[in-house]
């Protein structure tokens, strides 16, 4: 029987699939299900009730609450939703319950089809310590575990890892023996929070290693495909940021691909694997590699493999779960190159601080597909949120900070990288901060373009790509002027005397000052820019402004001339002459004061500020406020403690990651306003440090 005939014969096996997940992966699975004529069921938390994935499913079942533990990690609630909606199969996506063997057994025991590997295979790989023993016995190269009591200075750095972990959570690099205990404790806390299992182990940390992984697809009849490799060496906090297929390293080292595929197939056979999975390795530049783990699920980065093979990996998951054989002895050959960038709601310049709030606009050019392909050169966009005029997307604090995956495919690596860089640079990403600038800087970096990368790329060797924005100071000033011109046009259009220009005088020039903060939010003066719009009544030169560094900017035209309505989402086009060169900028104004300015100079997000600062917004010296909403997981000081600049005061967990709050000055802790377990919002007072320098200044003032 051919594969097509098998599919026709087995179609009744799966008729309605529930996806026990959220966001872009739920939308990805729904796409394949719809292509196959299957009915779809979503489950959603209260926070997700208006998300696209919940609207797109044929049926959606509420999981009361917001926290993962009461919603997407609540196995009983998910199974009850499947029963109520009449689902006969469950796809777990990735994360949440996808690698929970107990949940897989419960699905099967309920008479439903589990679209994933067997519970036994998940169990075998669920503990990284036990998995390493199995892999070593199967002949797969491994790194040995280290005993805490035996670790010496000469063995550093070492890596603390969660045995049940993944996604970078529960991982800590230790570089000094003094840090070993505290970093191990932090890894245990993260592991318990993310996976419900605080077991950790320690192994040697390879500083300049490269993360290489092999995509597996196996059926229940002994067939195993090593579909292709991916390189995921660009990471922050041990989480992948940019992935690509194939790997530049594997392409360069003779015979490495064959050895990788042989090891991956051996791993699959050792545990009787079926379905989609990934064998991850740590490699050096010589092509030597060591086993890291088997992810017993679909990976976030699976689109780059789909783009380079033409396969629908989710469709193959359905087929394997329905009992089909793999359609051929070997997978398709690799074709071209694909690169994926993960767009996160976070601030790389401030220790990857997660951002919550509103995404006002999220538009990309050159998108040829979403959740499939691409099968032609172009951009694939797999996004969780969607925006529309007057309907921003809201990013909360309960779930992962990833907004979307942007994937490019082209015949060559150079073309794929260039295409992705251009798409990200031109994208209209307005609202809360993202890592878009960092992604473009990485893709444009000479070493990245040459394939000279490793897992320390962001944290050690190329830190500047995370700290330097795409738009320089002059570009920010030019963009702010364009925003001010549109603001002036809006003001003119709403006055009764609209045909008399704002600030017009019979003699001399009229000057209007507009104030902006760079970024989304109220910000502060240090991150602000003031723009003077000068109109002359004595010439036809129109509005003009002279910026710093003696650059001259003159308005040529603004369309529409009477401004834009903030609520409609319609942009204004501003043509400026910058040092004699014409530039076209697109300006979107939003309710609440947000302004997105996009041009070939670079993207700039601004927030309108009042002409004069509100004294109530000024934070007292020595006061530390929460930079993000989250939960206080530990407090390391007490009132009266002497602290030094940079000393850890407490940690906050937000979006599944821990973030350290450190002292900003030397001094004495005079107040602690937060305790372990407190739920806090952005701007909440956490602590106050009395600085000797501040006291001296006060005394001098009093005298």
Question: Which residue stretches match the model-derived regions?
Answer:
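Catalytic cores of soluble metabolic enzymes centered on carboxylation/carboxyl-transfer
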Residues: 303-306, 311-552, 645, 678-703
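N-terminal beta-alpha lobe that positions the nucleotide/phosphoryl donor
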Residues: 1-279, 283-302
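Conserved nucleotide-binding/hydrolysis modules and their immediate coupling elements
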Residues: 538-542, 548-583
